[in-house]
Amino acid sequence: MREELLVADTLPGLTGVDHIGVTVPDLEQARTFFVDVLGCEYLYSLGPFVHDEPGDDWMAEHLDVDPRAVMQQLHFFRLGGRAIFEVFQYAAPDQVTRPPRNSDIGGHHVALYVDDLDAAVAYLHAQGLTVLGEPTVSKGPSEGQRWVYFLAPWGMQFELVSYPGRKAFDRAGGTAEAWAAHTAASTAS
């Protein structure tokens, strides 16, 4: 039986994140990245899905895309036995082909935990991927964490994070209340 994560007056029955969906320009390139670079397990494919009859607005009504958009195919990948990536390739008359930046509305990134950040960064460089800057050392509640962003071949942003000794927030008790008490005690001394 699944344990509900949230309290009353929130989404009933919510137990966690099921999958993350992303759209890519080339499914084979994405499959190579997810399987050969990240080590995901390929699960299965679906599609194509076409709704092109006059008056058929299923795609717009259900997915908020152009009514004539075609979902050419989608692949499912599992990472680390838990996270599922649902990866789409669309053809749409109004398709925007530039990935959003983090500062754009809808901008996003996927953060991946690694045990050895330096080894992971060296691996990404050896794979020919773009790593954005040098690893950053976090401060405050995230003290103990190092992180760096990198780009998938199609420009989607990913982040590597590592905090082998746990973050300060977690060492202080892992709740907002515990962190507030820790911060108050630190500033009082």
Model-inferred region functions:
Residues 47, 90-92, 135-136:
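Generic short beta-strand segments
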Residues 17, 24, 72-77, 82-87, ...:
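Short, structured motif recognition centered on aromatic/hydrophobic residues
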Residues 4-6, 94-98:
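A short, acidic/glycine-rich surface segment
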Residues 101-103, 122:
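Long, charged/polar, surface-exposed segments that mediate recognition or autoinhibition
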Residues 1-13, 22, 85, 112, ...:
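Vicinal oxygen chelate
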Residues 23-82, 119, 126, 138-139, ...:
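Core segments of cupin and vicinal oxygen chelate
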